[in-house]
């Protein structure tokens, strides 16, 4: 016997969260809970404004239609990425296809303060990895901050994310202020320039390795080994089903590229599932999941060690 519930939710964000030049005041999304006999599976559907093609209202419509079809015996996944991902997670939990083991190590997001980062990294076992958003301020400032961090913490490796913010000139301005002796400790810089060709040129000219992120979701993208390209950053909410995520990870690994499972600012429920996916598909790589503290609450499932209050399922708006 099958049954299902769909919940709508909204979490207040911290005041300083800006995505693509727009302030994100709340994180809006949906949960689906599927039951079959004694088994249960949950999934999160939370399109990311400015990044997802679909709105959460559109996702809600597709999700409700899919749930009704599933209750009638149809299991074909929807095409909409955020819905396909959430639904496939719920189905995977339902059938025990998503392992319970999780990688809760997260590359901490750094605001540029080395003292703050040293404290965050003190308890981190193994490789010291942190992430810095660049491209929000002047490229020269970004270069100076990155150089300062690498100089202050000799065993640090940084992941940088520019979200295609730079022109070739700005990329050169950034690199000018990063000591060439430190550049090998930049694990990768995600999508530095507005076009892939400009990003490739940046890697060749600076010796700083790059990673593809947005490019993975463009129709003309293919997985190929290229000079200067070290990694791909996979955001499952923006990608689609678990099977598609696994295919991308396997394609990257086949070329010797690092694959990083990364957050699209999901709630704690979605983040704990991403931690399980990372442990399953990319066990040797620290995932990019340090986004929970951008929110003012957790929901349904707790992230280990978080002190944020938890909203239980009974407090959510039930749609089905």
Curated annotation (Swiss-Prot):
UniProt keywords, alphabetically: Lyase, Magnesium, Menaquinone biosynthesis, Metal-binding
* Biological pathway: Quinol/quinone metabolism; 1,4-dihydroxy-2-naphthoate biosynthesis; 1,4-dihydroxy-2-naphthoate from chorismate: step 4/7; Quinol/quinone metabolism; menaquinone biosynthesis
Q: What class of enzyme is it?
A: lyase
Protein residues bound to Mg(2+):
161, 190, 213
EC number(s): the record gives 4.2.1.113
Q: Which InterPro entries match?
A: Enolase-like_C_sf (IPR036849), Enolase-like_N (IPR029017), Enolase_C-like (IPR029065), Mandelate_racemase_C (IPR013342), OSB_synthase_MenC1 (IPR010196), OSBS_N (IPR041338)
The prosthetic group or cofactor this protein requires is: a divalent metal cation
Molecular-function GO terms, alphabetical: magnesium ion binding; O-succinylbenzoate synthase activity
Pfam families attached to this UniProt entry: MenC_N, MR_MLE_C
UniProt catalytic activity: (1R,6R)-6-hydroxy-2-succinyl-cyclohexa-2,4-diene-1-carboxylate = 2-succinylbenzoate + H2O
Give the UniProt record's GO annotations in the biological process aspect: menaquinone biosynthetic process
Q: Which residues form the active site?
A: 133 (proton donor), 235 (proton acceptor)
Spell out the family assignment given in the record's similarity comment.
Belongs to the mandelate racemase/muconate lactonizing enzyme family. MenC type 1 subfamily.
* Chain's role: Converts 2-succinyl-6-hydroxy-2,4-cyclohexadiene-1-carboxylate (SHCHC) to 2-succinylbenzoate (OSB).
What is the protein name given in its UniProt record? o-succinylbenzoate synthase
Q: What gene is it encoded by?
A: menC
């Amino acid at each position: 016997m099958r049954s299902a519930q769909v919940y709508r939710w909204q979490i207040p964000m911290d005041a300083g969260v800006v995505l693509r030049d727009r302030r994100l005041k709340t994180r809006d999304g949906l949960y689906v809970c599927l039951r079959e006999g004694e088994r249960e599976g949950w999934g999160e559907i939370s399109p990311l404004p400015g990044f997802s093609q679909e709105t959460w209202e559109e996702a809600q419509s597709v999700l409700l239609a899919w749930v009704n079809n599933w209750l009638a015996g149809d299991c074909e996944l929807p095409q909409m990425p955020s819905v396909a991902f959430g639904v496939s997670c719920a189905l995977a939990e339902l059938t025990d296809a998503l392992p319970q083991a999780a990688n809760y190590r997260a590359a901490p997001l750094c605001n540029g303060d080395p003292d703050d980062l040293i404290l965050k990294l003190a308890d981190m076992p193994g490789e010291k990895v942190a992430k810095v958003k660049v491209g929000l301020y002047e490229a020269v400032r970004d270069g100076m901050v990155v150089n300062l961090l690498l100089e202050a913490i000799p065993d640090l490796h940084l992941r940088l994310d520019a979200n295609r913010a730079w022109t070739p000139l700005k990329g050169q301005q950034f690199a000018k202020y990063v000591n060439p002796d430190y550049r090998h400790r930049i694990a990768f810089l995600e999508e530095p320039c507005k076009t892939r060709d400009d990003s490739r040129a940046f890697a060749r000219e600076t010796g700083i390795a790059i990673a593809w992120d947005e490019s993975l979701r463009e129709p003309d993208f293919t997985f190929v080994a290229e000079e200067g390209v070290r990694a791909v950053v996979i955001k499952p909410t923006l990608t689609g089903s678990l099977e598609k995520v696994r295919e991308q990870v396997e394609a990257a690994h086949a070329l010797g590229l690092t694959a990083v499972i990364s957050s699209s600012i999901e709630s704690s429920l979605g983040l704990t599932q991403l931690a399980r996916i990372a442990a399953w598909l990319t066990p040797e790589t620290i995932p990019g999941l340090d986004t929970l503290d951008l929110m003012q609450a957790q929901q349904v499932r707790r992230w280990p060690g978080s002190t944020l209050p938890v909203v239980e399922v009974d407090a959510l708006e039930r749609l089905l």
